[in-house]
Amino acid sequence: MSTSVPTKNDVLVPETLLKKRKSQEKARAERQAEIEKKKAANKEKRAVIFKRAETYVKEYRDVEREKIRLQRAAKQDGSFHIPAEAKLIFLIRIKGINKIPPKPRKILQLLRLLQINNGVFVRVTKATAEMIKIVEPWVAYGYPNLKSVKELIYKRGYGKVNKQRVALTDNSIIEENLGKYGIICMEDLIHEIYTVGPNFKQASNFLWPFKLSNPTGGFRTRKFKHFIEGGDLGNREEHINALIRQMN
């Protein structure tokens, strides 16, 4: 009796194995389709982000040009150009917790200035102006320019995600937490803060208080005197930008 090895065609593939293969092929196709879909969405999103960034650059440039134009016009007329009141303040806590009365202590907590060298962006309102006046003996503050806002957020920016401090390494972190307010990337976040936009509160609350370094060269010898008396405390207006550079 002769025996022969069965050919490939003679061996029937079990139905369960066929179903498994079909299922795997379907899953593979679905995964690939999902990857392609994400690629297309990311490409579209990058284009949107790039377009927004271009728009912001033009907006910032136009505002600066208008300011220069008004200054020149005032100079020609022999008058003074009075700039618009600042809407944004950057506050830095530079004094510790010793001998703080309950009221300023509470306000420092509300402002999230819990440690020395913590910094936060604050919208200028009547209420915040009153609060700042009370905590002035513990803080340095002033009006940050665009360069300062950008450098702070890019270099020291952390977001509050599920009560955790998370580095802003990816635009997706911003989109997941602020996307519902139309803020989907770093440039959106910077724009919202710098222009004190309609969703400033959500944007500034998302940003974890900045942890700054001691200034290069140290604070002034009379650190706890007011800025106008040769110290570091209180309102230094545009001069806050120099301090930010030193501490960032």
From Swiss-Prot:
Pfam families linked to this entry: Ribosomal_L30, Ribosomal_L30_N
Domain of life of the source: Eukaryota
Record keywords: Cytoplasm, Ribonucleoprotein, Ribosomal protein
Molecular function GO labels: RNA binding; structural constituent of ribosome
Disulfide bonds: none
InterPro entries according to UniProt: Ribo_uL30_ferredoxin-like_sf, Ribosomal_uL30, Ribosomal_uL30_euk, Ribosomal_uL30_euk_arc, Ribosomal_uL30_ferredoxin-like, Ribosomal_uL30_N_euk
Ranges of biased composition (kind: Basic and acidic residues): 24-42
Secretion signal, residue range per the UniProt entry: none
Disordered, as annotated region: 22-42
Major site of localization recorded for this protein: cytoplasm
Any GO BP: maturation of LSU-rRNA from tricistronic rRNA transcript (SSU-rRNA, 5.8S rRNA, LSU-rRNA)
Gene Ontology CC entries for this record: cytosolic large ribosomal subunit
Localization in the cell: Cytoplasm
Subunit (UniProt): Component of the large ribosomal subunit (LSU). Mature N.crassa ribosomes consist of a small (40S) and a large (60S) subunit. The 40S small subunit contains 1 molecule of ribosomal RNA (18S rRNA) and at least 32 different proteins. The large 60S subunit contains 3 rRNA molecules (26S, 5.8S and 5S rRNA) and at least 42 different proteins.
Physiological role: Component of the ribosome, a large ribonucleoprotein complex responsible for the synthesis of proteins in the cell. The small ribosomal subunit (SSU) binds messenger RNAs (mRNAs) and translates the encoded message by selecting cognate aminoacyl-transfer RNA (tRNA) molecules. The large subunit (LSU) contains the ribosomal catalytic site termed the peptidyl transferase center (PTC), which catalyzes the formation of peptide bonds, thereby polymerizing the amino acids delivered by tRNAs into a polypeptide chain.
Family: Belongs to the universal ribosomal protein uL30 family.
Protein name as it appears in the record: Large ribosomal subunit protein uL30
Organism in which the protein naturally occurs: Neurospora crassa (strain ATCC 24698 / 74-OR23-1A / CBS 708.71 / DSM 1257 / FGSC 987)
Recorded name of the encoding gene: rpl-7
